[in-house]
């Protein structure tokens, strides 16, 4: 019922100009920007007073599992938003508490008659918003919500797919190709508009409603390094300009070459800014659209140009009506794979102490900076789940949710189900080798040396497998394996073969139960990304991974190929079609698997 109410409100018309002057509150949540903010424009329209509010729960900040890097990014984004509002003779009101407790007080204290906010498609958000809308109605407050966090109306996609979300990217593309183009971004709120509805700003505003510091929220900042990613709309728009400066990749569908620089944070990366709404996905979409038409002389851009944004929409659509999307139990689209419970192995993976330098360097970068390349995410996700440790993807979701700047409910959980072969037509017989993949990407090992300085003196020949280095080399490097750096947590060659066989048996049992054929040729999600244009340069590759994963290498596999898949260079066969099984449809109960 809550979802129904929230969805209905999402399409509520904005009040027309000339409406009796309202006292409006615009509630910022994810859309931390002034550009393309239709809900903010609805708050301003016909209002005598507008206050821009962000509700922050200090108790949640102190007790949640979200890491310090994401909190820092959020606070920087709020500071930037407040700075932009100051230029419009307004301020951001950061109110401490929970929405259900805060709004009744604000409605009375400020005489609020209109509440506006951006529609939230995720299950928790819809439930929260339905409760607030009910509360507002009882208080006589008009509620206006506008959809600007996604390109499409997700409910319409589901309706066109027979009242269920499409569970393959190919099907998703087919649905949206029948829909109208996304709405264009709306204009920026102007100083003249804000001047006509100025709210009174008290002298003690910073003390009462200012953006708190990390220390005020209880985070220890001693030893915290400088932010690699600066939060805020201003930074997001500057990055977008840099992102689009390289016209060649749009014109020629250049596929970026994977190299060591690809693994480092790029100044054109956009994923955290899309996640927090510092950058409008619609602005990004149409800036890409316009640039393509300019370069290609008015040719209509193909869907593949927007691949990263569409992966994001795909996962949002799959999750919008599934509150169990981030867990196995009760999740109708998730195969119930009997994962092992191994807290010790999970902890070593999360802390970067697996004994595989490639995996440990990635997890160290994630913990330090809050971001890793999309293929690095694939590597560590495969290692934790079906590749080596056979630990549930749910554990990976929780770790990424803590550490990733760009993690959100839909994309994070969807990517983990996808990479662990738990949903979305993945191929279980391909594994990332925790030695070979890194070595092909960065033969010199500079990435390892950057994040694992203990190993910096190892020669490149041994830096990806230091346990094979002679004792003399280990001593010369002042790093004895098993003493100064851990031995490998598993034998990858043996474990990956065993796990591929386990996954094969699970799929065969499931196939017999459902009457499906594992060898049936079905459309693969790799077809749509045969031109992965959404990554403009090798240094940018993966910077938008939150907007959706890239497919694993694909192609028919012989028995020998299946056993040797651990050594397959990832990313080299992305444009080939896969032959995979059709996974269970949403009606499959968890117990049946």
From Swiss-Prot:
SUPFAM superfamilies (UniProt xref): Cryptochrome/photolyase FAD-binding domain (SSF48173), Cryptochrome/photolyase, N-terminal domain (SSF52425)
Keyword Protein transport attached: no
Annotated spans, Required for inhibition of CLOCK-BMAL1-mediated transcription: 390-489
Phosphoserine modifications at: 90, 266, 299, 554, 558
Superkingdom to which the source organism belongs: Eukaryota
Cross-link (Glycyl lysine isopeptide (Lys-Gly) (interchain with G-Cter in ubiquitin)): 30, 126, 242, 348, 475, 504
Cofactor binding note of this UniProt entry: Binds 1 FAD per subunit. Only a minority of the protein molecules contain bound FAD. Contrary to the situation in photolyases, the FAD is bound in a shallow, surface-exposed pocket.
Main localization category: cytoplasm
Record-listed FAD binding positions: 271, 308, 374, 406-408
Alphabetic keyword roster: Biological rhythms, Chromophore, Cytoplasm, FAD, Flavoprotein, Isopeptide bond, Nucleotide-binding, Nucleus, Phosphoprotein, Photoreceptor protein, Receptor, Repressor, Sensory transduction, Transcription, Transcription regulation, Ubl conjugation
Annotated stretches, region: Disordered: 532-593
Cited function: Transcriptional repressor which forms a core component of the circadian clock. The circadian clock, an internal time-keeping system, regulates various physiological processes through the generation of approximately 24 hour circadian rhythms in gene expression, which are translated into rhythms in metabolism and behavior. It is derived from the Latin roots 'circa' (about) and 'diem' (day) and acts as an important regulator of a wide array of physiological functions including metabolism, sleep, body temperature, blood pressure, endocrine, immune, cardiovascular, and renal function.
Family: Belongs to the DNA photolyase class-1 family.
UniProt subunit comment: Component of the circadian core oscillator, which includes the CRY proteins, CLOCK or NPAS2, BMAL1 or BMAL2, CSNK1D and/or CSNK1E, TIMELESS, and the PER proteins. Interacts with TIMELESS. Interacts directly with PER1, PER2 and PER3; interaction with PER2 inhibits its ubiquitination and vice versa. Interacts with CLOCK-BMAL1. Interacts with CLOCK. Interacts with BMAL1. Interacts with NFIL3. Interacts with FBXL3. Interacts with FBXL21. FBXL3, PER2 and the cofactor FAD compete for overlapping binding sites. FBXL3 cannot bind CRY2 that interacts already with PER2 or that contains bound FAD.
Name this protein carries in UniProt: Cryptochrome-2
Provenance organism: Homo sapiens (Human)
